[in-house]
Amino acid sequence: MEIESVAAGSCSKENQMIYKEWFEFSDSDGDGRITGNDAIKFFTMSNLPRPELKQIWAIADSKRQGYLGFKEFIVAMQLVSLAQTGHEISHEVLISDVDFKNINPPTMEGLGVLMAKKKHSSKSSDPNMNGSPAADTSLTAHWFSSKSSKKISLSSVTSIVDGLKRLYIQKLKPLEVAYRFNDFVSPLLTNSDFDAKPMVMLLGQYSTGKTTFIKHLLKSTYPGAHIGPEPTTDRFVVVMSGPDERSIPGNTVAVQADMPFSGLTTFGTAFLSKFECSQMPHPLLEHVTFVDTPGVLSGEKQRTQRAYDFTGVTSWFASKCDLILLLFDPHKLDVSDEFKRVISSLRGHDDKIRVVLNKADQVDTQQLMRVYGALMWSLGKVLNTPEVSRVYIGSFSDKPINEAATGPIGRELFEKEQDDLLADLKDIPKKACDRRINEFVKRARAAKIHAYIISHLKKEMPAIMGKAKAQQKLIDNLEDEFGKVQREHHLPKGDFPNVDHFREVLSGYNIDKFEKLKPKMLQTVDDMLGYDIPELLKNFKNPYD
């Protein structure tokens, strides 16, 4: 399975050299990214009408990053060339039989003269050849050091993600630090959290086909993969792109600044010893990272013998992931207590959840209908949402579908379901930037509510006498205190954190040491949500809108 068409963006070496010169010429600030104004100046030389240029930008910037890297620039130039020769420009052209590799560069009126004038000036640095912003991450990494956080200029923001980093450091992070949001809800964000590739997490009871599912998508096994009928995967494995095939231990992964897993250190060495990263070169992993999880156990005793907080780890990954696949087996439809807790920990991420009924070719059509009904019944008691979750039925493995059980109708159904699921996965990189904005806004709202709760608890404490007794009373009646905060500030009840978890963390703190309400700080976050983020999206939208 390919996330993007291989043809678009590939070209001969001669054409690549031409495009490289054009890219360097049009990239006025030499940061390896062509943004709105640069694009308008350069693309105008093609003499194409504005609606066609708008469509070309939309297709080239398919991930909606707000800029074109070198690879996206090549795609744009190839589309310009096609438009000049009379082709209709649409998304379908990428999957058509057009020979992208041998498309001649487009005609750009007056470009040769302008480039000749610029020849005497020093050449700008080489752009990142693969189109990803990896070369630019070092430019923004130093923003996260406390000394430089106040000095980030607006001109240094060259993408939507850069803009989110700047807003986080200058406006949201001070609120999180003041009210200890990182201790109660989620660790502070780092540079790598913003630059990470989209992630897909697979959850399910043992032997429901999680590892086989990843193997099926990659069309090869990954380092450290174990497949069998018994509980084989005994650890959390992140499968991501890398220069060679290797497994990296969890403690090493957690301290690497270029990986978004530093927040996992809060779960301790017991968890990190059950966590590893598998790297391998693969075109699919250039766009998506997979998280393979241990099979959820069915017995309460096995759960209590885990040395780490399995539900907490799952919840941490859920907040980082773009898609969560719950895998079920027709022979394992019971939702165990631990699985129920795991699904409950996904609260707030309902839009990411997809249910997969795997190994469906192991039962005949009549049994499959009954199994599907039983699965819906089981999930209805666990997923406390009125909306229906999308359920995919199929057999996601390299083995041919067992037609003896399902018949030709079953085969056709499974193939259509597989196509739908693959289409969902293909959409992930395209929606990654939108998802990042969505998660950022969600985090900002959670931080605001957290600040209201903490400042309210501080306000309820006595000035001098009886502090210990007052603190215990507040902790015991925490649900009532949440209700007071909700009514006082007119907040939605569903946005409040889990009471039991909050109580557990709160019991280790002295409420009297907490900060009072700082209206100015909260107003800054409100302004960020109301004005700064819409302005950021406006600045990096399609320049031809």
UniProtKB/Swiss-Prot annotation:
Residues 194-429 form the Dynamin-type G domain. GTP binds at residues 204-211, 309-313, 359, 395-398. One of its GO terms (molecular function) is calcium ion binding. It is a peripheral membrane protein. Ca(2+) 1 binds at residues 27, 29, 31, 33, 38. Ca(2+) 2 binds at residues 61, 67, 72. Residues 292-295 are annotated as: G3 motif. Belongs to the TRAFAC class dynamin-like GTPase superfamily. Dynamin/Fzo/YdjA family. EHD subfamily. Involved in endocytosis positive regulation. Acts in early endocytic membrane fusion and membrane trafficking of recycling endosomes. Confers salt tolerance. The EH domain (1-93) is critical for vesicular localization. This is EH domain-containing protein 1. It comes from Arabidopsis thaliana. The lineage of its organism: Eukaryota, Viridiplantae, Streptophyta, Embryophyta, Tracheophyta. The gene is EHD1.
